[in-house]
Amino acid sequence: MNVRNFSIIAHVDHGKSTLADRILERLGAMGERDKRDQTLDTLELERERGITIKSTPIRLTYRRANGEEYTFNLIDTPGHVDFGYEVSRSLAACEGVLLLVDASQGVEAQTIVNAYLAIDNNLEIIPVVNKIDLPAADPEGAAQELEEVIGIPAEEAVFASGKTGQGVDQILEAIVERIPPPPGDPQAPLKALIFDSFYDAYQGVILFVRVLEGTLKPKQKIMLFSNGKSFEVDKVGTFSPGLVVGDALSAGAVGWVAASIKDIHDAQVGDTITEKDRPTAEPFPGFKPAQPVVFSGLYPTDTEDYRKLREALEKLKLNDAAFTFEPETSEALGFGFRCGFLGLLHAEIVQERLEREFDLDLIATAPAVVYRVTLTNGEVFETQNPAEFPTRDRIARVEEPYIKLSIMLPEEYVGPVMQLLQERRGNMVTMNYVGKRVELIYEVPFAEILYDFHDRLKSISRGYASMDYEQIGYREGDLRKVDILVNGEVVDALAVIVHEDKAYSLGRKIVDKMAEVIPRQLFPVPVQAAIGGKIIARATVKAYRKDVLAKCYGGDITRKKKLLEKQKKGRARMKQIGTVEVPQEAFLAVLSTEE
């Protein structure tokens, strides 16, 4: 069977989508009219940021010099650390991968992680050194690094350039020769892996599948393993980019299925499809519902939009298996949703897609991780919302998630980066030298890298450092909840959970920032940061002042005192009943103090 299923994996920005464009062009899948960059990046946002978020598959035909025809299924994958689960599912649908390395930058943190993912899935790896047309390129050096770090022999590497198209023919030949054809018996009971899905207004949920065994065809009754629900297949087909209707998908094929599935939650990515009357013995292993690790509240600026936001989140969840949300209310912001994401980039993209595609105006609260709290009565519970954090006298201990962080960087930046990691409470595990570069491995509390760690890392290393991380479980920490009070009232949406050592400085920054953005009232407004009952920082928004003495020319001092006293009493009365509106900018200001 002349079929090859493969995927391209690389570190962000190593030219994966551009190389995919050249392969499509060489195989005639792009007419002159379609020639735009990053053909496989379908979301407007992906093209704008130049990153791949959703995995997009495509079917191609390759004719060798001797006239043999091969069908290639290329599954494009995201390269960003947040979308690791998407990558792992796309890889499960392949037999081999092209592992791209930028000739001018060498092996980066994610290259290593992606390579190990491929090795774990027993995939054939074809190393490709890309961007050899760059003046700073050192293809032999990059191939050598691959051998040192991952153990892929340097002589196996194919040198190519996604820009000029050089080396594309060698890559195509390598795919035919090195990647094995897909196994599987078309006569066996049906077994197909869902590696992505999206919602279509007319056909319901459309599943992207890799058929492992058996044959999938219209009118068939299929069943989903994870929940036992069954559906009838309406249409099947392949991708060329865009959905093309076909007759059937047999073992080894990659394609799509429409089966009038109305609810997105029925079709989980990573689930196995089988035939209802003749089910396969066991599902494809490794299915795990994606676990969100970063949480943030999303609130509509206009409370009227609550329903609209809910519908938008439902629709987005359709295409994004890893995103979760549940309703929550805040005294300060009204009704909204607590949303879970795979990471910060994921959170940013979801928010941007909501604002763009559904025309919503949103406020996001500070991102938080999931803390595990043990109370004095022995009860254990998890919370990611600082507003739900219990008071200090009820807490026996608090644990926070830690990550194993690996950073690749040129050796001259090691000092400043280690200092940054020390500030972020990191513990060093090991340090490896790879040529002129260093791999640092640290264990760091996840919360410490949430806000601006990546930006700081990039600026300290002039953009040369790259990072990747994985969760390694919970550890105990001295964490405190800092409450922010405006005019004596606690503003729940502004609470933050922070390590004891940083509580004072963070509280100070927040109150100073808040005092700048809260509009002045007719009475002075204190803004305070508190841990439990203890105030640790305060700033005051000065009052507007009416000049009550304007009418007194010269004259008696007692008269002036009387007027000032009267003004003071009026203010005191106003302060008791006056409420202070905390404006939108104040919430955003808190997020930006996180430096």
UniProtKB/Swiss-Prot annotation:
The keyword Thylakoid does not apply. The keyword Endoplasmic reticulum does not apply. Its EC number is 3.6.5.n1. It is an enzyme of class 3 (hydrolase). GO terms for molecular function: GTP binding; GTPase activity; ribosome binding; translation elongation factor activity. SMART domains: EFG_C. Required for accurate and efficient protein synthesis under certain stress conditions. May act as a fidelity factor of the translation reaction, by catalyzing a one-codon backward translocation of tRNAs on improperly translocated ribosomes. Back-translocation proceeds from a post-translocation (POST) complex to a pre-translocation (PRE) complex, thus giving elongation factor G a second chance to translocate the tRNAs correctly. Binds to ribosomes in a GTP-dependent manner. This is Elongation factor 4. It comes from Deinococcus geothermalis (strain DSM 11300 / CIP 105573 / AG-3a). The gene is lepA.
